Amino acid sequence: MSAPSLNDLIELGAISEAQGLRGQVKIRPHSSEPVALLSSKSVWLSLIPRRDAGLSSPVEQASLTQYKVKSAKMHSGNVVIALEGVTDRDQALALKGARILVARDAFPKVETDSYYWIDLIGCNAINLQNETLGEVIDVTENGAHGVIAIGDASTKTIQYLVPFVKQVVQDVDLSNKTISLDWQ
């Protein structure tokens, strides 16, 4: 099976260590609710660490290896998965540091007025005065709520960090790639 295009693969976490003796790996997910990672039937691993790839450099196609997922579960805030073909601790340890990617079309459907953070990236942020604040270039969590980073996408320069809460976010229109904010 071939990998989807690079634009369709979403990084969801990284392998932090081996789990047990039977080849399972422990993944440090980027999200506190890693539903897409837990439900995926296959994942792609990249052994190029993010710091070496550079922030503007996507995962290289040649560095990707696809694995079928035999099982996945939550354990102490991490995701533990068993990958087909990884059968012992030494094989699992060799994958330490690998980035975990999943095809975007493999994500479970979300309810109305719910969004995957990845779908917000690239949206234009507009305030109530209809002024463009910039483009959403990143989304993070601070423990209490999501935070969208708005700025210049070409330079990755952040101009605003805006809480993603209903008091601030007035509307999200993914079809038009816009987010209306009560923000100056």
Swiss-Prot record:
UniProt domain PRC barrel: residue ranges: 112-184
Main location, first listed in the record: cytoplasm
Keyword line: Chaperone, Cytoplasm, Ribosome biogenesis, rRNA processing
A Pfam family the protein falls into: RimM
GO CC, one annotated term: cytoplasm
Molecular function as annotated in GO: ribosome binding
Gene3D superfamilies: PRC-barrel domain (2.30.30.240), RimM (2.40.30.60)
Top-rank taxon, per record: Bacteria
A biological process from GO: ribosomal small subunit biogenesis
Subcellular location: Cytoplasm
Subunit comment: Binds ribosomal protein uS19.
Entry note about domains: The PRC barrel domain binds ribosomal protein uS19.
Family statement drawn from the similarity comment of this UniProt entry: Belongs to the RimM family.
Protein role: An accessory protein needed during the final step in the assembly of 30S ribosomal subunit, possibly for assembly of the head region. Essential for efficient processing of 16S rRNA. May be needed both before and after RbfA during the maturation of 16S rRNA. It has affinity for free ribosomal 30S subunits but not for 70S ribosomes.
Protein name as it appears in the record: Ribosome maturation factor RimM
Species of origin: Polynucleobacter necessarius subsp. necessarius (strain STIR1)
Gene this protein is translated from: rimM
